[in-house]
């Protein structure tokens, strides 16, 4: 059975970088998918689906539920390793509930943990505006993305806390201790 870890955090929390470094360090055992990268790859392809996705991403809004779930399920099925890390998901209560439903209807993938990379809004804003990754990294879009992230957050955290799947990593440190702590946490969870 494949073991899935979801990494959540505010825009600029470092969740994608953290997950990517963990997977790169253990590529034979861990596959990393970023929801954002999966969606941006569709946009870059120029497909009709990509154009639909772009109309949401460019404004900092959520992509429709069915598109996101289908994108993720395809990625999970294609994963070449036992351990899979997906960052940036879920971003809404609806995504969480639909994904939980999809996972409960199959026996190939087990959600082992939801790791929150926690940072303050101030740190997140400084990081996002400093990285200049694309058109979706400006102040107006940042505040919209923060709102989109924080509005459902308590309900998402409550849901996973009740399932004893929620874990927190302090994301305000330098990258090395964050990645080391996350690696250690994943190993600990896998051994339970």
From Swiss-Prot:
Its main location: cytoplasm. ATP binds at residues 12-17, 131, 173. Pathway: Purine metabolism; AMP biosynthesis via salvage pathway; AMP from ADP: step 1/1. Residues 34-63 are annotated as: NMP. Its EC number is 2.7.4.3. It is found in: Cytoplasm. Pfam families: ADK. It is an enzyme of class 2 (transferase). It catalyses: AMP + ATP = 2 ADP. GO terms for molecular function: adenylate kinase activity; ATP binding. Catalyzes the reversible transfer of the terminal phosphate group between ATP and AMP. Plays an important role in cellular energy homeostasis and in adenine nucleotide metabolism. Consists of three domains, a large central CORE domain and two small peripheral domains, NMPbind and LID, which undergo movements during catalysis. The LID domain closes over the site of phosphoryl transfer upon ATP binding. Assembling and dissambling the active center during each catalytic cycle provides an effective means to prevent ATP hydrolysis. This is Adenylate kinase. The lineage of its organism: Bacteria, Pseudomonadati, Campylobacterota, Epsilonproteobacteria, Campylobacterales.
């Amino acid at each position: 059975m494949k073991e899935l870890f979801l990494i959540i955090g505010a825009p600029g929390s470092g969740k994608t970088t953290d997950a990517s470094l963990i997977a790169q360090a253990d590529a034979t055992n861990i596959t990393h998918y970023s929801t954002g990268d999966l969606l941006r790859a569709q946009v870059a392809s120029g497909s009709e689906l990509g154009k639909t996705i772009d109309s949401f991403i460019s404004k900092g809004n959520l992509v429709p539920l069915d598109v996101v779930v289908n994108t993720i399920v395809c990625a999970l099925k294609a994963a070449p390793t036992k351990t899979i890390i997906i960052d940036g998901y879920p971003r809404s209560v609806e995504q969480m509930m639909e994904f939980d439903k999809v996972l409960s209807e199959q026996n190939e993938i087990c959600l082992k943990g939801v790791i929150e990379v926690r940072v303050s809004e101030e740190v997140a804003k400084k990081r996002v505006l400093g990285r200049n990754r694309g058109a979706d990294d400006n102040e107006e879009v940042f505040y919209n993305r923060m709102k989109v992230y924080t509005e459902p957050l308590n309900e998402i955290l409550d849901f996973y806390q009740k399932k004893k799947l929620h874990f927190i990593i302090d994301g305000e440190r330098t990258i090395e201790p964050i990645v080391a702590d996350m690696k250690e946490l994943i190993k600990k969870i896998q051994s339970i």
